[in-house]
């Protein structure tokens, strides 16, 4: 006796079924599922204070420039206490060599 009935495309090979159900669609009812959808995080930027940084060794003219000027130098070239050219200090940050003031 053959293990498969003539309805091979509809029915897998197995024992002979009690009812001929080759033309009936296979319907399977599953239990309801619950899916939780998490929202993606949102980045909020609040306005805050604007902080500016300045080089620590930048000197702005003041009444103490005569006392401090003798200890300041730009790449080994001393800065005179009687006033100096700012290009000497600023050129240090631009990659060019400082010239004597």
UniProtKB/Swiss-Prot annotation:
Presence of the UniProt keyword Endoplasmic reticulum in the record: no
Report what the protein is called: Feather keratin Cos1-2
Top-level taxon of origin: Eukaryota
Q: Which GO terms describe its molecular function?
A: structural constituent of cytoskeleton
UniProt xrefs under InterPro entries: Keratin (IPR003461)
Give the record's family classification: Belongs to the avian keratin family.
Q: What Pfam families does the annotation carry? A: Keratin (PF02422)
GO CC terms: intermediate filament
Quaternary structure (record):
The avian keratins (F-ker, S-ker, C-ker and B-ker) are a complex mixture of very similar polypeptides.
Q: Which UniProt keywords apply?
A: Acetylation, Keratin
* Keyword Acetylation in record: yes
Task: Please list the residues that carry the modification N-acetylserine.
Answer: 2
């Amino acid at each position: 006796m053959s293990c498969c009935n003539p309805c091979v495309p509809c029915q897998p090979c197995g024992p002979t079924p009690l009812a001929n159900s080759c033309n009936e669609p296979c319907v399977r009812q599953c239990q309801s599922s619950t899916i939780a959808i998490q929202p993606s995080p949102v980045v909020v930027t609040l306005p805050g204070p604007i902080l500016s940084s300045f080089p620590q060794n930048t000197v702005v003219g003041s009444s103490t420039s005569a006392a401090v000027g003798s200890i300041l130098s730009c790449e080994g070239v001393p800065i005179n206490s009687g006033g100096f050219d700012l290009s000497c200090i600023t050129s240090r940050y631009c990659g060019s060599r400082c010239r004597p003031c």
